[in-house]
């Protein structure tokens, strides 16, 4: 599991989104295979021209500036209960060694050459664009600093280096960022050498999700020869970065550098004969990125991996962005949502739930809304929190005294056809397969919906049977109580990746041992029998 953080003065909600989505899948794997170690890499990309200029503007040395910013993302990850096992910074010496090793390996294969290169350069995106990838706009409010909610553009949410009203601006069609014409001597990577292999890979496997993104990559690879990639910048223009091995007048291109953090984080280059590599976390099972940096991860990184003789990523999740009133979040527009403020106001798990429930389809951009956040807070509070308090009320507990115990199997058989109890047990029996299928297909929102649907049915069952009411037969009180607690137990296990603190408190209150909070215990215990007194706790 791998996700990286760009640097920012203050992280916005899009940064938290990527971390939470990656964390959900990491925690899911820990539940699914508790004996398998999950390596979860997060971190910050800290080189590049924009960082260099921003540090200069603040009168700080770049390393001091980067340390301050990286600390913000560590704080974000810690507050959001992100379960990363590794946090890498591209300014670490171990990362420099990885970049230098990869450069030398590619150079020794004749894949790197020096050439004069001209193109449209974006400081924000830290890359060159061709004539076909840019356009001229007469918009006087052209955005100089484009702050996407993706999480791998190294400096996507730093304040603009300059933001000046201009009569016309040349911008990237892909990102909307301003570009300037540059001509300079750079080192180039023979990207076209890997085009046939990449095209074969993507036409024979389902690697990228959502599928439309894989279609886009196949179209790029099929539409004509790939241009070789500029992988260095003159030291005179970019001093803040990894020096090119054996050429101190050149600095390694920030994306060549940044993409290799996936390898440096798990110790590449591995020493021969150590057995490391696959056992250390490669190939990665899943990378979580923003859709705007897809080509870096779907073309550039795989080309480098092929050159190194390493297997490609197994799956690549390129999620959509969070917007404000259908506009991309941008400090220059003043519409950046503060994740710390949201978590302080609504609670960490409520924000995590909202990001997954609303943003878990990944196909289309989603609008960040305080109103919607409040709505989903009430949803999970009602469906889960209130259900737990209702079914464990003292009035219902007292009605269970002396009642004859029955198993869930017996309750199911004794329930009338079409009754709420029978519907709930049937839905609960189907939940594990529905949930797992959605998670395995990277459909986070659908997985949550499956849980909420069962919880909603459990609430209906409690309403229909009214176990607190004196007219309800004791055996019906017992049936509803037993089924509802089993629903909460299974829902609690499934909800651990999404709302870990709340799920833990629920399972503790239900008396579920830690070793029993894994996938093999998600199946309905149809043989469960006996009244168990449970004291409800407030979850939200």
Segments from the language model and where they lie:
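Basic, alpha-helical terminal appendages of large translation-related enzymes
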Residues: 1-4, 8, 39-43, 59-60, ...
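Short, surface-exposed loop/turn segments at secondary-structure junctions
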Residues: 85-89, 366-371, 469-478
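Structured secondary-structure scaffolds
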Residues: 1-34, 41-42, 94-98, 171-397, ...
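Short acidic (Asp/Glu) and glycine-rich catalytic loops that position anionic groups and cofactors
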Residues: 80-82, 322-323, 332-333, 358-368, ...
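A glycine-rich, aromatic-flanked flexible loop/lid motif
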Residues: 354-360, 387, 391, 398, ...
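C-terminal amphipathic alpha-helical
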Residues: 380-389, 443-449, 488-502
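N-terminal, positively charged nucleic-acid-binding surface of large information/translation enzymes
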Residues: 1-201
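Long, amphipathic alpha-helical stalk/connector segments used for oligomerization, subunit docking
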Residues: 367-372, 376, 380, 394-421, ...
């Amino acid at each position: 599991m791998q996700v990286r953080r760009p640097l920012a003065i203050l992280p916005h909600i899009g940064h938290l989104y990527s971390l939470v989505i990656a964390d959900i899948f990491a925690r899911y794997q820990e539940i699914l295979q508790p004996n398998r170690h999950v390596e979860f890499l997060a971190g910050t990309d800290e080189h590049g021209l924009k960082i260099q200029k921003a540090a200069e503007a603040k009168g700080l040395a770049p390393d001091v500036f980067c340390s301050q910013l990286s600390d913000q993302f560590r704080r974000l990850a810690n507050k959001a209960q992100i379960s990363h096992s590794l946090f890498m910074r591209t300014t670490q010496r171990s990362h420099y060694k990885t970049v230098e090793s990869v450069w030398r390996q590619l150079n020794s294969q004749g894949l790197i050459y020096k050439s004069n290169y001209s193109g449209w350069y974006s400081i924000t995106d830290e890359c060159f664009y061709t004539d076909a990838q840019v356009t001229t706009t007469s918009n006087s409010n052209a955005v100089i600093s484009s702050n996407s909610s993706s999480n791998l553009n190294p400096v996507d949410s730093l304040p603009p280096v300059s933001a000046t009203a201009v009569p016309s601006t040349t911008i990237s069609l892909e990102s909307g960022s301003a570009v300037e014409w540059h001509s300079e001597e750079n080192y180039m990577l023979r990207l076209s050498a890997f085009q046939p292999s990449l095209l074969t890979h993507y036409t024979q496997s389902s690697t990228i999700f959502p599928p439309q993104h894989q279609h886009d990559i196949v179209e790029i690879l099929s539409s004509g020869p790939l241009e070789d990639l500029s992988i260095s910048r003159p030291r005179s223009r970019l001093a803040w970065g990894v020096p090119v091995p054996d050429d101190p007048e050149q600095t390694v291109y920030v994306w060549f550098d940044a993409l290799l953090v996936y390898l440096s984080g798990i110790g590449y280059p591995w020493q021969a004969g150590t057995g490391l590599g696959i056992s250390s976390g490669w190939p990665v099972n899943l990378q979580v990125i923003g859709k705007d940096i897809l080509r870096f991860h779907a073309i550039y990184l795989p080309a480098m991996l092929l050159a190194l003789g390493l297997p490609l990523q197994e799956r690549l999740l390129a999620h959509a962005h969070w917007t404000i009133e259908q506009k991309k979040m941008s400090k220059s527009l003043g519409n950046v949502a503060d994740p710390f403020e949201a978590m302080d106001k609504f609670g960490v798990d409520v924000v995590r739930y909202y990001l997954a429930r609303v943003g878990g389809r990944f196909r289309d951009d989603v609008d960040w809304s305080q109103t919607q956040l409040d709505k989903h807070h009430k949803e999970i509070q009602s469906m889960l929190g209130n259900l737990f308090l209702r079914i464990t009320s003292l009035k219902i507990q007292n009605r269970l005294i002396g009642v004859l115990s029955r198993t869930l199997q017996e309750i199911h058989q004794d329930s009338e056809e079409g009754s709420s109890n029978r519907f709930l047990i049937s839905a609960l029996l189907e939940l594990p397969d529905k949930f797992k299928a959605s998670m395995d297909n990277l459909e986070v929102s659908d997985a949550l919906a499956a849980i909420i649907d069962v919880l909603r049915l459990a609430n209906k069952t409690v309403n229909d049977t009214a176990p607190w009411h004196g007219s309800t037969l004791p055996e019906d009180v017992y049936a509803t109580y037993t089924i509802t607690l089993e629903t909460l137990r299974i829902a609690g296990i499934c909800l651990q990746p999404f709302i870990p603190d709340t799920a833990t408190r629920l399972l503790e209150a239900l008396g579920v041992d830690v070793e029993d909070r894994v996938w093999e215990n998600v199946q309905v215990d149809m043989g469960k029998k006996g009244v168990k007194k449970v004291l409800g706790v407030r979850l939200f």
